[in-house]
Amino acid sequence: MADPLLPESPLARARWAVTSWRLAAAMWMRAQYSYRASFLLTSAGNLLITSLDFAVLVLMFRHTDRLGGWSLPEVALLYATSAFALGAADLLVGSVDGLGGQIRSGALDTLLLRPAPALAMVCAERFTLRRLGRPLQSLLVLGWAVHRLPGRWSAAHLLMLGQLLVSGTVIFGALFVGGAAIQFWWGEAKEMQNSFTYGGATLLRYPPSIYARELVAGVTFGLPLAFVNWLPLSRILGRPDPLGLPAAFEYASPLAAALCAGAAGLAWRAGLRAYRGTGS
């Protein structure tokens, strides 16, 4: 028998999940904002720490004019787009990487009793706005990079830049959820998951031309991180694709994001079906 609380249409289910996430996240935000000084100091500290990553890139360019043939504003564009995608995904669904701890403590059993989608509840658990520092800082770098690259920004290119930020966020969000799903079977998979999310963002902040062709192929056809920024920015900046792929790949970020989201959703559902609870 179908669950009477479960909306029938996929669109209604999606709205229900978003509403559940929003309500749970708002609850955690109110709890944090009751300690305003601590909240503001933590947020400012997070913004400062994430800024150090870009400072490292700037220091590198004090010793060279080009990195793999890319200028500082071009590399800044790579940095900003990858950092925003990771930061936005971490803000929205990053709490899901603590699933292993929730399974061990029995907290997941409590979340499953709530009349709301389990994934929305896990993603919103202990939601914190201090993670807003990374996407905010990356937007500042993005604005600077766009300003330093005049003459490249037609309406089509600006539209492409906007969609790659959204697609990149979805791709990293899918990596968070897919990696968390593995924790249903392997509770210590968090570090492996981090190597793909945080490690992947670090990889993408540098030009693809400095990496081996095999690595670029691996993050294009294996783990599709190249669709976060390498491929679409190659089109915007007029850079050659190291793999010599058809031009259609440079526009395929939304398709890659949809496929990643679908795969992550299937992995989550499989893990949830396999979960038997702690008996607590």
Located regions from the model:
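Hydrophobic transmembrane alpha-helices and immediately adjacent juxtamembrane helices
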Residues: 2-280
